[in-house]
């Protein structure tokens, strides 16, 4: 087997092959023949699926500098080494079905990367540097142990497909709603109890799958005209299990995002002072300075500064920004024309988040 592999690599070097297939070769170590002398300078695509590799060589980028695609599906790799960040031409990296516990920060150096697949590993977190991947279009991190997503993920401005199924997420960063190119978001099989108020506000986002998040009972009304998956949601549980603000209408009780501190009804015509102040500051920021540098952490707590950068959400009727206070309104799914599409599980509802009593009275999802 070893001699056969050496021969395959030698031929590839001699004939300057751009593609090299070393799948199913029972490799326990990265072939030294690949790293010999100057390496394979012409190689662009390396496929090493279903071997037994545990690591990657530190001089990988030096010996294979023109790699565009690296396919390492189904190995035993535990750590993505720092050297991976030097593969500046890499566009596709597949490390699905390995034993990954750590993705090094240097992955942010892969500025040409378009597709990153890390499904079925042991990851508990992603480095913030993932946000440096400006060309990234596809990110699959399903079937890991992630408790949260990095907020800097919203800086991946080219991201179109995000798959985070079967992790341990309890919340979704509201910053993800700022992704301008996101078309499909799948978060099935997590521990979500609420979704960001602005999720679905972007016209680009057309597909949202949140199946089997049993505590999730409310979907932002922006998702009403999208393709959604919500089977297995809204299973009755003890409210004490979730420490979030709740809102009830009829027999349906939904959890609200953690940033929501207070809710209003049609009788609450006056907004809390903090909410009024935040809205005024936001209008000033957008109308005059276009820059939050005029506010410092000394004059305003960091948590409120972050809300000014990225509001809690926007009114589902008039798009007024909201920060800590909302007027919610529930439309049970079973009472909408979509009920027939979700016969197995209809004990959830669409939640409209409004900025005032006037918008609350006016908003009608079904008109």
Curated annotation (Swiss-Prot):
Listed Gene3D superfamilies: Ribonuclease Inhibitor
Lineage of the species this protein comes from: Eukaryota, Metazoa, Chordata, Craniata, Vertebrata
PROSITE patterns: LRR
InterPro entries tied to this protein: Leu-rich_rpt (IPR001611), Leu-rich_rpt_typical-subtyp (IPR003591), LRR_dom_sf (IPR032675), LRR_domain-containing (IPR050216), LRR_R13L4/SHOC2-like (IPR055414)
Keyword Repeat: yes
Organism of derivation: Mus musculus (Mouse)
LRR repeat spans: 16-36, 42-63, 66-87, 89-111, 112-133, 135-156, 158-180, 181-202, 204-226
Record's protein name: Leucine-rich repeat-containing protein 28
Gene: Lrrc28
PANTHER family recorded: LEUCINE-RICH REPEAT-CONTAINING PROTEIN 28, PTHR48051
Keywords associated with the record: Leucine-rich repeat, Repeat
A Pfam short name: LRR_8
